[in-house]
Amino acid sequence: MEAESTQDIIIVGAGISGLATALGLHRLGIRSIVLESSEQLRATGFALSLYFNAWKAMEALGISQHIRSLGDRFQGWVVRPISAGDPPKEMLFPESEEYEVRCVQRKLLLDALAGELPQGTIRFSSKLVHIELSGHYKMVHLSDGTILKTKVLVGCDGVKSVVGKWLGFKNPVKTSRVAIRGIAHFQTGHELGRRFFQFYGNGVRSGFISCDQNTVYWFLTHTSTDLDKKNHQKIKQFVLTKIKDLPDNIKSILETTDLDSLVMNPLMYRPPWELLWANIAKDNVCVAGDALHPMTPDIGQGGCSAMEDGVILARCLGEAMKAKNMKGETEDENESYRRIEDGLKKYAGSRKWRSIDLITTSYTVGFIQQSRGKWMTLFRDKFMSSFLSWLRVKKSHFNCGRLSHE
């Protein structure tokens, strides 16, 4: 089968990083297509907390004001051990922009990103199965037999990235923990307030977060169990057992959660040392989002850093494409290829150490918060709980910049 007409940029995966990259390119006047294997946008994970770095990325993409209308701003955190005993510690946020945190349903965020793209940008039911070299181009083979030809290939296809494997990445490593997530809806409103409640200890870390007046997102991470992820009734009972010492208003959130909204998945991450020598970009191919830096959710930076990726990648590609247009239509193909390659190398260089930092910090925070050891527990509960909460905010103090330096 012959390839369809040549595309400038193909992005694989319509998740946060893929859509952010496509929207960034669109804002710069550069067309791309996004290949999504599912029949519609996927919203795995239910909700995510958006920190300072995410807001800077969304400002660059032109969607920040709309997203602000979708979630209440946090007033602060309440942190305490999951077992009865020590009193809770509270951290109130200043009103400055560095401390703006909101929890937004993932589907609403994806819809907002996709809604800003030109019609036809996203091609659903388009599963990548093979990548083939063709001179300075890449031939993208889909499961239905379609072949697409592209000048740039961007892998935003998640933890099991086909593009990542082509670049030489190994599969992410499973931790000894699983995450159980859910979302509760209250027709007459909930009483959680606008604070992020966190509980930890005894091998457990859990959180309860208001998205809006009627919706609460919650999660619980725990050492791996033999629970069947399809048996939602047993999963719900398991979580209720783990939070039995928490206040009644917290337990009522779980009791209100519909069984259909429960999901359980193993936590995975990319060993940070792999990024020291890995090819984040090679030739005219690169990866972003979970395809680049899968991490545990302990500092809430998976989705936020994916938006950073999208803005920075769009800027680097935009600089390369704009330079091409300035030289005119007769530009040598080799020169165009070299400039795109240099742009992707620039992107890779800017994301390597940021990714290593976030992966390492997230894994370490999760290890400390879920520790069962006597001395580690004492040290954490007495001295570390406030510091770990502060660290979550500190790691979000990153500004990806604007889409264009002009």
Curated annotation (Swiss-Prot):
Domain of life, source organism: Eukaryota
Reported cofactor(s):
FAD
Q: Which SUPFAM superfamilies match?
A: FAD/NAD(P)-binding domain
Q: Name one Pfam family in it.
A: FAD_binding_3
Q: Which residues form a coiled coil?
A: none
Annotated keywords: Monooxygenase, Oxidoreductase
Q: Which InterPro entries match?
A: FAD-bd, FAD/NAD-bd_sf, MOase
Q: Gene3D superfamilies in the record, alphabetically? A: FAD/NAD(P)-binding domain
| Family to which the UniProt record says this protein belongs | Belongs to the 3-hydroxybenzoate 6-hydroxylase family.
Q: Report the protein name in the record.
A: Monooxygenase 3
What taxonomic classification does the UniProt entry list for its organism?
A: Eukaryota, Viridiplantae, Streptophyta, Embryophyta, Tracheophyta
Which gene is transcribed and translated to give this protein? MO3
